[in-house]
């Protein structure tokens, strides 16, 4: 990876004009690969970028990674390509058609912890001043970077966005509350990324007979909830222990979160065939 080269005139480098995905590998196998690639297609469509490969071709490229049975992630990024700097798309400023720049790389990650060892996270609130197209997984992540850094400086692990009193999501994860036995989370859309792990979790919850409410959630409701947790591709589920420096209940992974995490881990094992001979296969 240290030998990779990208032009200084790549639009991703100069304008953050691109989209990306992060795909978790369990024992060398990508989880929910098709869902990630479908989201990449939606993100690319959202910025009027034509992907250089079809979803099936992208899956074939990812499956070529020879990582054995390693735990880790694949980062996939597509930008609008290389051309002289201009805010206009290349085809609108007299340029010849420009091929997109696409890159993949693998990064090893520690194996995710067992259920009894799931870590807690401390959240710090941040005013949600991001744009209105958070459903696009854009490489323009400066607002998220600033929010997360401010949270860590304040002694937290992650920033949680508040939009006029409503909890939307975190700087690098989706946010969930359990209220009277129901899972409550903000609907996807302008302010919330359609997280792949989020979608898997909510479908599993419905299969388990757990009520799911996709609706706006106030900060006051969150602070009075029975359980709070966050979820993402690289972390699965982490329970929330502190909010703006103050401890919150229940002080451990609650019963609904535990039940859902058990189902998620079993689903991952089933989809990634973790008990079979190691070989990369799409999920």
Regions of interest found by a model, annotated:
Residues 162, 166-188, 194:
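Glycine- and Gly-Pro-enriched alpha-helical subdomains that act as flexible
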Residues 1-159, 164-166, 189, 193, ...:
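Conserved alpha/beta cores of soluble small-molecule-handling proteins
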Residues 197-198:
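Secondary-structure junction motif
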